[in-house]
Amino acid sequence: MKNKSRYFLAELLGSCFLVMIIVGSGLMAENLTNDVAVMLIANTIATGAGLFVLITVFADVSGAHFNPFVSIAMTITGKLKKKLLPFYIIAQLVGCLIGVGLAN
């Protein structure tokens, strides 16, 4: 059970931070300029950099999926045990909801 809680926490935090980065950088980009192209570039760079850091931090703990469809694909390909899939999906969804709430 100890490992399951580590996986759960890693996916929850990673998903939460990823959504906070995406939403937060989008909100900041809107305040940066009126040029939509510049907004998209700023949001993309921030999201890519944030995702790189999150994958670096959480890859060794949970695989850094941060997305239910990635976890499902990993289960189908045999890289994630079926019994862990519900923990991953719940953690990711809860993390995303918390992240949106904190970013707004």
Q: What name fits each language-model region?
A:
Residues M1-N104:
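Membrane-interface helix-loop junctions and terminal tails of multi-pass membrane proteins
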